[in-house]
Amino acid sequence: MARVNEPFEGVIMYRRDYRERDLLVKILTDRRGPLMFFVRGAKRKGFKLASDILPFTYGSYVGILADEGLSYIVSAQETHHLTGIGADLNRNAYATYLLELVDQAFEEGRALGGWYKQVMAALNLINTGRDPQVVVNVLEVQLLNRFGIAPVWDRCVVCGRSDLPLDYSEKMGGMLCLHHFAEDPYRFHLTPKTVAYLRLFATLNLAKVDQVHVDEATKRQLGRTLDKIYDDQLGLRLKSKRFINEMDSWTNRLLTARKNPGTDDEKKPAGS
């Protein structure tokens, strides 16, 4: 059966060298999820699609979409660059992690349904300067279902009550209310704010929000909570996530150094 050209929407996830003049380009498509495209001659000077296949470019394309093996791009109809992501290291790091997480969560060649719009909404929020950690945390909560984990966020898993203080339990697979905290001595001891945001994030449609304000202390606890769930229950340790953690560590060191500018000098021996 001859393969035919099809129009599709997509965002460039990443690309890598293939042979001397060619590239393999991973695109998150609206119709078939993540697909790997072979782009012949993409590294040649003056290649007509050069700007259309840069990372964090999105738009309308035409190509051959393969159920198995490599797909092919024929043309780009209209494309745009997420320039805010490309110009900022922090935004770039979180957007890269988001797309790597999505790549792990969805099989190649399977339609995404509403997920494509949710991912694009997340990228657009990051691109326009919204807090990238908060945006990515929303998707981390929602993508757990795709990985086969379905925490109960909105009520106690034992009695179903939602009107009492709640805390998260990995052992029980969701929230415990105050009356059932004893069911898990290793519950997370989350603050009410963190619990409230986890419950909100589980159903939040990013296409319908402009901003979600989260204070720094709650952001830290949200980050630690989701890192622990992904580490303990999925064993998912992505390279892009490690980079974010390292970047946060560098930032904390710089902030500490600025708060204590004389610390290093005070440690030096007299006369040095």
From Swiss-Prot:
Top-rank lineage group of the source organism: Bacteria
One cellular component term from this protein's GO annotations in UniProt: bacterial nucleoid
First and last residue of the signal peptide: none
UniProt KW keywords: DNA damage, DNA recombination, DNA repair
InterPro entries named in the record: ARFGAP/RecO, DNA_rep/recomb_RecO_N, NA-bd_OB-fold, RecO, RecO_C
Pfam families noted in UniProt: RecO_C, RecO_N
BP-aspect Gene Ontology terms: DNA recombination; double-strand break repair
Role, per record: Involved in DNA repair and RecF pathway recombination.
Family: Belongs to the RecO family.
Record protein name field: DNA repair protein RecO
Protein species of origin: Limosilactobacillus fermentum (strain NBRC 3956 / LMG 18251) (Lactobacillus fermentum)
Organismal lineage: Bacteria, Bacillati, Bacillota, Bacilli, Lactobacillales
